[in-house]
Amino acid sequence: MKTFSAKPAEVKRDWYVVDAEGKTLGRLSTEIARRLRGKHKPEYTPHVDTGDYIVVVNAEKVRVTGNKEQDKIYYKHTGYIGNMKSISLGKLRDRRPELIIETAVKGMLPKNPLGRAMFRKLKVYAGPSHQHQAQQPKPLEI
């Protein structure tokens, strides 16, 4: 019996919508990253993008435990000397809540061109509405 290897043209991708309201950030992000990679499918192949599309709604209502709302700091560097920017999770939730889930999931995906292709299949929205009704996403309970 030969080892099965999925071909990019033969991969069937489904659309799922996930409601992040009241869900813990890490547990939610782990399952989203797993589905973006395609590890939940029997035809998973490490070097082929076999994952599904994930639409996340209510990103502003995702839950974190402990004092992470004030203690967790996100850092970025602009590339200029002395321009290290930092923002707490609480302030980031007020400004761009979708970035919280995007950052968590991006850190769980491979750091290569395949990981970037997987990340492009993630669509995150702060509120309850999204613009992907035409794809008829199925609800996914995590």
Swiss-Prot record:
Part of the 50S ribosomal subunit. The keyword Metal-binding does not apply. The keyword Cell inner membrane does not apply. InterPro entries: Ribosomal_uL13, Ribosomal_uL13_bac-type, Ribosomal_uL13_CS, Ribosomal_uL13_sf. This is Large ribosomal subunit protein uL13. GO terms for cellular component: cytosolic large ribosomal subunit. GO terms for molecular function: mRNA binding; structural constituent of ribosome. Transmembrane segments: none annotated. Keywords: Ribonucleoprotein, Ribosomal protein. Belongs to the universal ribosomal protein uL13 family. It holds the Pfam family Ribosomal_L13. It comes from Methylococcus capsulatus (strain ATCC 33009 / NCIMB 11132 / Bath). It comes from the Bacteria.
